[in-house]
């Protein structure tokens, strides 16, 4: 595998491309701007093409494309921002045009054309002589009443003044450059004076300061004024205005250093001492000039020449040297001349030095032209504005030594040319004047750019204020953590027996409490006593017919030995016969086998289990092994464990206490067997729960039994009967349902119908809970083999049928 520092290095030339290809989300804007796509592609193609596979080149191409797309996005965003800014600026200009003062029609012919390249040397700055300042408005119409002073400082060039001065400077540059070796001697004869006039036009959007020089000699001011006037009327004639004395001044080059020191000294003195007095002096001079013009043309020209003369020590070449002083305002010396200060000049501005001309002719032309022009002069920081009927440009003899110093320099870049004049041009509204391509506008203006908008406020996240009242102290928190008392719950005392439950039910149902025994649990000796069968001897056949009738009645009544608690014996039975009364405890806990006579033995097997002792059933052995009968004397009680023959009129009494007639027998303690009122009328259970129902069909016959009673009552099993449930297979509800089905099958057999019961008919009209119980008991019986379940089709009716052969449920 190859290794290339150009590709692998993060800071290499292709580092940003790899980042864009693999981790585009981590690409930064600085990386996008710093990536040069052509050079990156050249490096990939020229240096690493042979060593790279197409797969690597594909990723490099992907990175290049992504960087290029990001560059396009950045450019698109910048263009949108610029377009939005231009639209907002144009909208503001339109609103200002609607609300501002309308301009006269004469101003529409002037506009600004912006060439592709600003070549100031090629500009043709001509002067329109037929334009007489028709765009000048009164000061009140163009000035806001509550406007600030900064707005007043922005003035506009006058058309004639700007063009005249530019041509004058350009002409002097040409003449001075050709004859720079001839003039230098008379540089100390005159001093410099800088004069600036700030003329405001209707838009009041820019200001330009013009630097002018005035001579010291009192003999030459008339000649300089004449040259200035000629320049306003005919700028092209400046090419032939050349002073013959300049050839001698230029020759003295060795005095260059002395001139510079003198100029610096004069500038420093003027700035320190005459900065504050210029406003009043200029105002006095201007007022004096206006009064002199009203007298006569000639007198006004002479006063203008005389007022603008300065002594030699007041020359100010500070603007020529590019010294940057007060941003606005002017200074005057001795109440005669004002010396304005330029904002920023990197190159000196030469002033044409002309000889004496026809003064009267130049002054008249200058006055005729300026009578129609209204100019506003900005005085000292732009705070004082006055209207003047005339505006003049006074050009006097300049410091020849300084001019020679400026032109003697061998550095060609230091020579003055038209490009050194700082002129700011800003596009405004589109011009109505159609100018051909490459042409220039006769007017240049400084248009203030729109004020910078306030940047959007950076959103800061709010500090989260903490509520001291909600804070939980550390001490409380420690106590809550260490204390686990609230997590512990007291355990409820669970009773070991069901006595509290029985007591609660007893008070809830007081009518049933009379049927329950006072002693809930019996003795184990009594329970074992009743487990043995009772055998009764049949009456003698040799008795009277009445005795025979009584014997048959005993045989019949032996089947109903177990009585319900509410059954009361009749008087005939108590007189004629003696029955063996059995307590409910014996009926529930033991199996009875009663023998009547020597041959006929009717056994009634009672299936019950011991609830406390847990003894096994002994009824099956007792039924299979008969006891040998013995003869008992009259009036002798017979034990239940022996089979005896009882003499007539001798009652057979068991070991239990005989109950008198019409005495109700208490309910059995077995809650499971006698749990509902319906069980009081049923017969005893079989001795064994596994006995087939076909062996003793009459035992399961229930009179007036309803299936609703079976299903409505909840089955309750106490703690004493849990052992019986483990030994037995069927619950009481299962037995009751089996009895109900047995009864139904017997009735169908008697009617000679098919022994079949529909489960849908049994569940019809019952609740969901009862239907579920019935279905469950049906499944239990089906599992034990008592019934047979049949369903012909899915989701169809289920039929319960009796099994064809006897089976023991196991």
Curated annotation (Swiss-Prot):
**Gene Ontology CC, one term:** nucleus
Q: In which tissues is it expressed?
A: Low expression in shoots, buds, siliques, leaves and roots. Found in, but not limited to, actively dividing cells: in procambium, protoderm and ground meristem in roots, and in shoot and floral meristems.
- Cysteine pairs bridged by disulfides in the record: none
Q: Does the keyword Cell division apply?
A: yes
Superkingdom of origin: Eukaryota
Q: What is its main location?
A: nucleus
Signal peptide, first to last residue: none
Q: Which UniProt keywords apply?
A: Cell cycle, Cell division, Chromosome partition, Mitosis, Nucleus
Q: Where is the composition biased (Polar residues)?
A: 606-622
Q: Does the keyword Phosphoprotein apply?
A: no
Output compositional bias ranges, type Basic and acidic residues.
Answer: 220-234, 273-310
What biological-process terms (Gene Ontology) are attached? cell division; chromosome segregation; double-strand break repair; mitotic cell cycle; sister chromatid cohesion
Please state where this protein is localized.
Nucleus
Q: Where is this region: Disordered?
A: 200-244, 273-315, 606-626
What binding partners and quaternary form does the record give? Component of the cohesin complex.
Q: Hey, which family's this protein in?
A: Belongs to the rad21 family.
Record's function text: May be involved in sister chromatid cohesion during mitosis.
Q: Please give the name of this protein.
A: Sister chromatid cohesion 1 protein 2
Organism of provenance: Arabidopsis thaliana (Mouse-ear cress)
Read off the lineage from the record. Answer: Eukaryota, Viridiplantae, Streptophyta, Embryophyta, Tracheophyta
